[in-house]
Structure formats: C-alpha cells, structure tokens
C-alpha cells in the first residue's frame, strides 16, 4: 500500500510539475504570440480582378488565386472529406488533440518514422495565419498555444470556413473554391465526391499528390481520403465504390477571362499599384473599366489585320528557324510538338513546322499535334523581302516559299490556313468618348506577348499632317475663315541656321495656286499650312496647341511645326481631336469607372468632367479678332507684323501630358471650354470635307466614305518625313479615334513598295496615313458605328451659312458656288469678281519656284 501511495504522490507531483512547466512555458512564450483576435476581422488575400464596363472579367492579378466561399456554399461531403483526413476528432478537441498526439507518437515509435500528422485543423489554421513553415520544437509549441486561443475565440464553423479558404492546395490555388476552379474548372458545389476527395487529399503534400503532377499518386491519395470517409461513416460502401472507380479528369484551368485587353489591363494594374502598393494584389479589389467586349475586340482586330496587311505588302522575310534541312532525317512528331509548345503565340499567329512540301501544297504541324494544309492562295503574298522599299518576284509554287523542316508561322483566314510572319512594324489605337473622356478602346501594339511597351500612351511620335486641324483652328481663331484664300505654290526661303533653302513641298508635289482654307486642309496641302502658320505667327501657333492638351515641351517653335514636327502620343492626339468633336471642351481621358472592395462596397466612382456645348460655359481664353490678321481688302499679299506673328496666347495651367488617366471622385463638373463652340464646328466640318471632298477634288481620307458609307464622320491623315510615322484620326457620333503605325526603331521608315519593270505584279505605292493607318481606323469605326443612327452635322448658334464662290471665297455671283459656314460676323461681304485680285495669304516670299 505504501508503494501505491508513494506512486500516487509521485504521479501528482509529476502532474503538478508538468502543469507548472507548461504554465511557465506559456508565460514565457505569451509575449511572442500574435493576437488571434485579428482572425475576427481577417482579410484573406484575394487577387485583383479587372472587369469590362459590362461586367466581364478581362484580367486577374495576384500571386495567390483564391475564390472565397462561405461554409454554407461548401458541400457537406467536402467538409467531411477534410475532417476525416486531416482531423477526425475536430468536433471533440479544444485546439490540440491528445489522442491524436499519442496515436502519432505510437506509430512513430514502432515504425521508426513519423507517418501520421498530429496537427489539428485548428493548429494548421494557426500555422497558416501566424507562423512560418519551419519545423522546430518552438514553432510546434507556439502552434499549440495559438490553437487553444483560437478555439476560445471562434466556434467550430468559423474555424472551418477560415481553414477551407486559407489552405494551400497547389498551383497557386488557396482555398477549396480556387482549387475546384484550377483543377476541374468548376465551382465547389459542382464537384463530384471523387473530385472532392482529390482536393481534400492535397494539404499533406500539394505537389506530391497533385493530379497535374502525378496522376498515380493523386489517385492513391484520393482513395485514402475515401477510405477515411468510409471508416468515419461519412459515406456508404456504394458511394465509396462508385467514387473510387471514377477516373480523375483534371486539367489546369486558368481564370475564366471573357476577353483580353492586355494593354489597358496593365494600365489598370499600374494605377492600382500606385494607389495601394502590394495590397492591390491581395485585397480583392474589383475594378470596372470603361471598355466593352464588342468595341475593344473590334479595335484589336482592326489593328492586327492592318499590321499584317502592311507586313505582307513588304514581302516575306523567310522562316523563323530551320529545324532540319531537305535530305536530312526529319524530326519525330513528339520532338516537333515539344518544340512548338515552347514557342509563344502572337495574336492570330501560331507557330508551325513544315513536315512536307510539294509545288502545290505544304503540310505543317501545330503545337496541339494536328496538321494543316497550306496552298498557293495563302502564300501568294510572300514575295522575298529585300528592304523596306523593295520586294522580289511573286512566287509561282509552294516550294518557292517553304521547305520541309522550316519553323514558320501560320494563321487562319476564313476557313483556310495562310503563311504568316511576326510583323516588325507596330501600331496603336485609342478611342474615346468625346463628351466624357471615357476610353472606349485601347490597343498598345500588335500583341502584348510580343512587346509590353504601350504605344498608345507611351510612344511619342511625330504627328505629321495630323496636326493641321489644330493649327488651322488657331488661324481661324485669329481671323481666317474656311473661305480664306491661301496660295498653293512652292515655297523657298533661306534658312540661316541650316545654311540652305528650306523648301516645304506638298505630297504629292502638285500645286493648285490660290485655294480656300477648307481645300487646303481637305487635300492636306503642306505649303498652304506653312502660309497660314506664317500669317498667325509660330509662337502663337505653338502656344495655341496647348489648348488641346498637348504638352509644351513636345512642341517646336519653328515653321516645321506646320508639317507636324511635334511629337505626341496617340492618347494625346485622340484627346485633341475630341475637342473638335465635342464643341470645344478639353476632356480628361479615363479608363476606370468604378472600384469595389472585396465586400462589394464602392470605394471609387468616376465623375468625369464632361463637355457641354449646350451649356453657357465661357471659353477660358480670350478670342482673337479677325482684324488681327486680315482686313477685308483687295491686296495680293498680306503683311503681318513681327509683333503679331510672335504674340503668344495667355495660357492657364493645364494638366501634365502624362496625367494619371483616371477620373476623380466628386460632384459633376464641366471640362474646360478651350475653343468656342462655333469655331469647333467649323473645323469639325472641315474634317468632314477631308473625307468627302468637293466637286472637282477628293479629300485625303476619301476611303472612309467608301468603307463606312455614312456622312456624319470626319478625319485627317498624317504622314511624317520619309514616312517614319503614319496616322489617321477622326470622329463619328459619340466616338473619336486615333490610329498610329510605324516602327519602334525610329531609324526605319514605312517606305514604299517600289515598282520594278523587270518584276510583274509588283505592289507599288506610297506608305502614308491614308494607306498605312486609315484602314485600321475605317475597320474599327465601321464596327463601332454599326447600328448607330446617322447624325447630320448641325450648326450651333453663332454659325451662319453663306453661298460663296469656290474660286475666290467671296459671295457667289455665278454657278461655281457652295454653301460655306462662318462664325457670324466673319462672312464675306463682297461679290466675287474674277477679273480683280482677291485677298490671298501669300506671305511675300522672295523666291518662288514658279
């Protein structure tokens, strides 16, 4: 009895000593433990999602893929699968499970290694939220204490919901919602019992038991989970047998992107990072943009097709690679497929390998293991590329172009496969709502995988004749009218700085003598623009451009400004054209309409400053009177004083060129009124003439009339020296769009496809705005305006219509007449008399070439 008594005393002492040691250890560790109360308000790391204006997902950013689900959204079978596998006594313990610890220790003692885990679900939750993954005794002790605290703070359902949303399940999937989507492309409530068991088996070793990594191990682990569920009574024998017999159909499923707009999505990502830092990728923000699927896809298609058309005009540069030569042993299909899978795709272009070729047909293997046929029709364009200005002869048979063993690029055209190549030229498109500044579509290049440089907002390119509408607006604000006569004859003036004559020329070099300003813009006459520039003064013109939002540092103060030597981005150009389309208001482009937090609360909503030509909003600049430039007198030349030429327009502080393109919260405000509404209408009307011309002459943008078949549009071509840049910008009802095309390498020009008498069927022609950029504008605008009722140009108050003589710009006295618009008070008062001289802007050059 004494022995038993001593044994009991010893046991009590050991228990007290153990309890005291545990308490002392707890008091020592307690200051190091995190506050588990934060779990009450925990915010799981949820990726940022970017949506279109109509709610379609277009991008997702974040290292962790998580789709939060509530416990009542998770099927009971999935919950039971995790409990049976990870913590069968979950509802019985209080954070740590002594029975589980004893069982795991016994197995380890007798087997010689730890084959069973002793961590409860609550301990795993503590580790996932608060501790590092290091395997140390101190971490296990902290984990146990934290688990006890968590059980005191949260009920079992709250613990389960946090755990099932937090646990890492492989392939960047965190939580059961993300795992269901990643592996099976389903929501959790759509999973079969077998699929639930696969996911429940992953926490132990997400990489080892991953069905995308090892199907055999995934099946074995699934069967273990099903066995545990059966032994715990969660499923019947019949359910077990059926689930165990099912094959696992798992594939990687990326986020379900409805459509892609990568350049604009990247702009959103950058804006969100600038605002919120790294938390932008983790706090579950949902960003709604201003674009829609139809419009954005039309823009991307228009740009890609136009770039490919340009590239084909200039010839075939040959295969991307030669994998084996004719006569050598061909590669087997697996080696070909593996090689192709490692290559990217660029828009519609797919990598392929020619596996056979004869004069009539070639067969090419694709990355998915299928083969396609290429015929002469799909490679007739492939003249050998010699330079940007010359191509070789038209191929006559398939083997003139491709040979077996070549790695090429192909694309589908209608139901046929065509030979293709990755273009070296690039392009951008920006489309805005001119009333609000909302970005309707944005394309920053041919393909984001090819180049992430966003040419729509980052590429400063010379604008060429795209600048002329702005400069003519400045000239008309200082006294010229659409009927003013300017001398279309060559100019030659000594340039002391260059030590030679400066001789701006028309393109093509054709001259018509005195013509009206409307025709000068419509036919893009360079020398006419130079004369108007000289009439108003270079400094005045340069300062005036800032009204349209163009940054001063990119504007040159020389006469070459008249020919478009200033450099702007497509976004800046589109914004400038919006002023002419909306009645004279400088809108701020924006692309984010709304931001929601992870709970669906709106934390930002755009309140753009809108254009309102019907509102009584004064112009923020003083208007220059007509008398400052022209008196209505019959003189052959008009002299303008040097003081008048260089007088600058007072400029209030405008936005920086590279503004953050996101509208701010606040009450409704109106955009700055920078040119008066009647003046904006005049230049808008002139841009319409650039497309439709007049009897006797065509505008440079005439193709838009043919392609769109509507009269409520206007636009302007733009081409720089040596065709390094080509533009087309213009408007339609509710939309303004600018398209640029060129090479990123400023040393290269778009060139011309030079004709050769020795080569038949050679394409030849000048690569300028109308040929190189306008096709994309036309295709895009046709798609966007489909179904939009035509809206005729209606003169605003302050505009009068006068019948003028086409040859003189004076009041009509015969049949050669047209109706012309004037700001009230600027219309001509004299009848046209052809025998007497007319007021002509000629600038008094001392050297005339004819």
Please state what every model-predicted region is.
Residues 1-51, 89, 108-109:
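N-terminal type II signal-anchor transmembrane helix
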Residues 22, 27, 111-367, 532, ...:
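Non-catalytic, structured segments within soluble enzyme domains
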Residues 67-72, 389-399, 422-427, 450-470, ...:
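Short active-site loop at a secondary-structure junction
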Residues 78, 289, 293-296, 300-302, ...:
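A penicillin-recognizing enzyme superfamily signal
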Residues 82-83, 229, 299, 359, ...:
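Active-site SXXK
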Residues 91-101, 174-177, 236-239, 453, ...:
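Short, well-structured active-site flanking segments
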Residues 110-135, 186-189, 256-259, 435, ...:
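Conserved catalytic neighborhood of penicillin-recognizing serine enzymes
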Residues 500-506, 537-575:
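Mid-domain, small-residue-enriched loop/turn segments at the edges of structured enzyme/sensor domains
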């Amino acid at each position: 009895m004494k022995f038993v008594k001593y044994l009991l005393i010893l046991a009590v002492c050991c228990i007290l000593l153990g309890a005291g040691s545990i308490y002392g250890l707890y008091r020592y560790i307690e200051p190091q433990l995190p506050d588990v109360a934060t779990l009450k308000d925990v915010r799981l790391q949820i990726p940022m999602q970017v949506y279109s204006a109509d709610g379609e997902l277009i991008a997702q950013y974040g290292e962790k893929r998580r789709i939060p689900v509530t416990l009542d959204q998770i099927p009971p079978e999935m919950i039971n699968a995790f409990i049976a596998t990870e913590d069968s006594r979950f509802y019985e313990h209080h954070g740590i499970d002594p029975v589980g610890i004893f069982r795991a220790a016994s197995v380890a003692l007798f087997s010689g290694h730890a084959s069973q885990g002793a961590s409860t679900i609550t301990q795993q939750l503590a580790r996932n939220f608060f501790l590092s993954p290091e395997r140390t005794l101190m971490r296990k002790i902290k984990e146990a204490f934290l688990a006890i605290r968590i059980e005191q703070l949260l009920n079992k359902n709250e613990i389960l919901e946090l755990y099932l949303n937090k646990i890492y399940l492989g392939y960047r999937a965190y939580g059961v919602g993300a795992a269901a989507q990643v592996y099976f492309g389903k929501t959790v409530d759509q999973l079969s019992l077998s699929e639930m068991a696969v996911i429940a088996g992953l926490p132990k070793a997400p990489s080892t038991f991953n069905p995308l990594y090892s199907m055999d191990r995934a099946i074995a682990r699934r069967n273990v989970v099903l066995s545990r569920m059966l032994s715990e009574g969660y499923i019947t024998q019949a359910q077990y047998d059926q689930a165990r017999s099912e094959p696992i159909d798992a594939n990687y499923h990326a986020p379900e992107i409805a459509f892609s707009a990568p350049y604009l999505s990247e702009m959103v990502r950058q804006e969100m990072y600038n605002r919120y830092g790294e938390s932008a990728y983790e706090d579950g923000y949902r960003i709604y943009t201003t674009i829609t699927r139809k419009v954005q896809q039309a823009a991307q298609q228009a740009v890609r097709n136009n770039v490919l058309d340009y590239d084909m005009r200039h010839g075939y540069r040959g295969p991307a690679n030669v994998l084996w030569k004719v006569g050598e042993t061909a590669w087997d299909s697996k080696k070909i497929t593996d090689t192709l899978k490692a290559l990217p795709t660029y828009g519609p272009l797919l990598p392929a390998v020619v596996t056979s070729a004869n004069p009539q047909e070639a067969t090419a293997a694709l990355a998915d293991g299928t083969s396609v046929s290429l015929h002469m029709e799909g490679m007739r364009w492939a003249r050998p590329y010699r330079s940007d200005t010359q191509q070789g002869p038209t191929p006559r048979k398939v083997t003139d172009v491709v040979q077996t063993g070549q790695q090429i690029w192909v694309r589908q055209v209608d139901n046929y496969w065509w030979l293709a190549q990755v273009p070296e030229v690039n392009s951008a498109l920006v489309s805005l709502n001119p009333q609000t500044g909302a970005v309707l579509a944005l394309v920053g290049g041919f393909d984001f995988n090819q180049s992430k440089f966003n040419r729509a907002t980052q590429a400063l390119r010379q604008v060429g004749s795209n600048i002329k509408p702005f400069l003519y607006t400045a000239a008309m604000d200082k006294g010229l009218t659409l009927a003013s006569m300017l001398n279309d004859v060559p100019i030659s003036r000594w340039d002391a700085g260059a030590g030679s004559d400066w001789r701006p020329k028309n393109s093509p070099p054709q001259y018509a003598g005195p013509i009206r300003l409307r025709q000068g813009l419509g036919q893009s006459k360079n020398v006419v623009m130079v004369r108007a520039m000289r009439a108003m003064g270079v400094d005045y013109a340069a300062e005036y451009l800032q009204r349209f939002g163009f940054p001063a540092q990119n504007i040159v103060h020389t006469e070459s400004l008249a020919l478009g030597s200033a450099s702007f981005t497509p976004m800046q150009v589109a914004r400038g054209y919006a002023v002419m389309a909306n009645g004279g208001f400088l809108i701020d482009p924006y692309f984010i309409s709304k931001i929601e937090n992870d709970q669906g609360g709106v934390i930002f909503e755009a309140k753009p400053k809108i254009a309102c030509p019907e509102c009584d909003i004064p112009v923020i600049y003083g208007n220059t009177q007509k008398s400052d430039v022209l008196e209505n007198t019959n003189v052959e030349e008009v002299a303008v004083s040097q003081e008048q030429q260089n007088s600058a327009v007072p400029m209030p502080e405008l936005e920086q060129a590279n503004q953050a393109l996101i509208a701010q919260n606040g009450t409704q405000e109106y955009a700055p009124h920078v040119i008066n509404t009647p003046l904006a209408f005049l230049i808008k009307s002139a841009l319409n003439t650039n497309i439709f011309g007049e009897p006797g002459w065509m505008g440079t943008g005439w193709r838009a009339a043919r392609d769109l078949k509507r009269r409520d549009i206007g636009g302007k071509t733009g081409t720089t020296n040596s065709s390094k840049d080509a533009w087309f910008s213009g408007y339609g009802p509710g939309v303004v769009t600018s398209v640029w095309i060129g090479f990123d390498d400023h040393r290269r020009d778009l060139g011309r496809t030079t004709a050769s008498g020795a080569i038949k069927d050679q394409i030849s022609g000048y690569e300028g705005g109308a040929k190189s950029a306008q096709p994309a504008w036309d295709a895009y605008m046709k798609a966007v305006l489909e179904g939009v009722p035509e809206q005729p140009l209606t003169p605003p108050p302050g505009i009068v219509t006068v019948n003028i003589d086409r040859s003189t710009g004076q009041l009509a006295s015969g049949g050669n007449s047209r109706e012309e618009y004037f700001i009230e008070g600027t219309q001509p008062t004299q009848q046209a008399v052809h025998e007497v001289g007319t007021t002509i802007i000629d600038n008094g050059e001392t050297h005339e070439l004819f």
